[in-house]
Amino acid sequence: MINKKISLGVLSILTAFSLQSVSYACTGFIIGKDLTKDGSLLYGRTEDLEPHHNKNFIVRLAKDNPAGEKWKDPSNGFEYPLPEHSYRYSAIPDVTPNKGVYDEAGFNEFGVSMSATVSTSANDAIQKIDPYVKNGLAESSMASVILPSVKTAREGVALIAKIVTEKGAAEGNIVTLADKDGIWYMEILSGHQYVAIKFPDDKYAVFPNTFYLGHVDFNDKENTIASEDVEKVAKKAKSYTEVDGKFHIAKSYNPPLNDANRSRSFSGIKSLDPDSKVTYKDSNYELLQSTDKTFSLEDAMKLQRNRFEGLDLKPLDQMALDGKGKPKSKKAVKGYAYPISNPNVMEAHIFQLKKDIPAELGGGVMWLSIGSPRNAPYLPYLGNISRTYEAYQEKSTQYNDKSWYWTVSHINDLVAAHPKPFGTKVIDEMKGLEKTWIAEQDKTTKEISDLVVSDPKAAQEKADKISLDRAEKTFKRLKAIEAKLVKEKPKNKKGLNRS
């Protein structure tokens, strides 16, 4: 998530924990289907920017577009022709579209899923040769332009490549797109350079805000899509670097690895594979990681909630509670570092794609936490839904008791500010809910999969009803938890409640 300055305010103690110089801080991951216990492909991302930044969850319905109509991004002036017909897709937008839509992630009606983006930036030498284009393609437009326009993940990558070639990129980004044939991982490196690969089924990856691609076989056209001048630009910038005699993309395009990317790369890999040989002091982390372990959906959720469990590090936002003062940036400070689960997480999503789920249903399930999942649940959504629960659609930029995001944000604030009395009670309950839903989801998906063959409309109505009912019940429970925390929170010396 790239830097967007929005003045939002909820007065809480957690404000003292938020980090200055926010810029960007998303963390993405992929777990190939050969490494999962049930053969599903898992991938997703935490969307990070700042505390108290409302996100919605909606479905944008299919529509016909007038000839010549364009997508226009008010945040940077980017424009691109709309297709004659826009496909239906789900989205997780911001509530301030005049500052960028940021649809972020979702399924479209053809079973293409997308997470966009993990923000990145090339080194200064590269940017002098191929600078970013101010009104080029940015994260704020990515999902909104691609998901309603493509029928396969490869088509999505090809469309991004076409746009970056013709109009340029406004920023560096990592994008992931998937369908029934697998997942593509794409790095938009500089103003007009990009490389995308078909991600291997037998590897996993954790990628915060830096480039990770090493050597790529540009001649493998089936599994690689790349701009023509990737090596040429690096050579012209005099940042061209080889490893074992082969061009290494990340080492050629990256700036030096910063502390926040180091801590999240290291802890993410260790969260999935504690036996991994990576160390906190490594100069870089390769994209494609190998292991003899297999993983579950719960492991992916655990990854996105990671706060250095089992490691000799503590989260930076813990410093204030420990009486060590407020961190002024994401730089590591004497045993404290920037975790994947941090106060800037605004939502987290995990796509669980399975071969036996029809493309009409998205080919899988998106598990979504609006608000940080630190003390909130992931709810399952199939790709054929046409509606979302009303609490997901509240657009307030300050606390609103009818909003899913603001309710979860308040719960997270309260638990983070008062860890001793509240402990892990909330997250333990959330994990219990998730365990129940995971156990139920295969049966639900099977029923709707059988129905979609004979009656797609009835299948959509059933998916809508199940997801709306679950969301309504869950939101009522979240409101009850919020009220209980407010009632039980410690009081200051004057007897006043503290948020």
Curated annotation (Swiss-Prot):
Catalyzes what?
an L-aminoacyl-L-amino acid + H2O = 2 an L-alpha-amino acid
Q: Which residues form the active site?
A: C26
- Report which superkingdom the organism of origin falls in: Bacteria
List, alphabetically, the InterPro entries matched.
C69_dipept_A-like (IPR047804), Peptidase_C69 (IPR005322)
* Keyword Phosphoprotein assigned: no
Q: What's an example Gene Ontology biological process for this entry?
A: proteolysis
Keywords (A to Z) from UniProt: Dipeptidase, Hydrolase, Protease
Question: Could you tell me the EC number(s) of this protein?
Answer: 3.4.13.19
Q: Name one Pfam family in it.
A: Peptidase_C69
Please verify whether the record's keywords include Hydrolase. Answer: yes
List, in alphabetical order, the Gene Ontology terms for molecular function in this entry.
cysteine-type exopeptidase activity; dipeptidase activity
* Family, similarity comment: Belongs to the peptidase C69 family.
Question: What's the protein here called?
Answer: Probable dipeptidase B
Q: Which organism is it from?
A: Streptococcus pyogenes serotype M3 (strain ATCC BAA-595 / MGAS315)
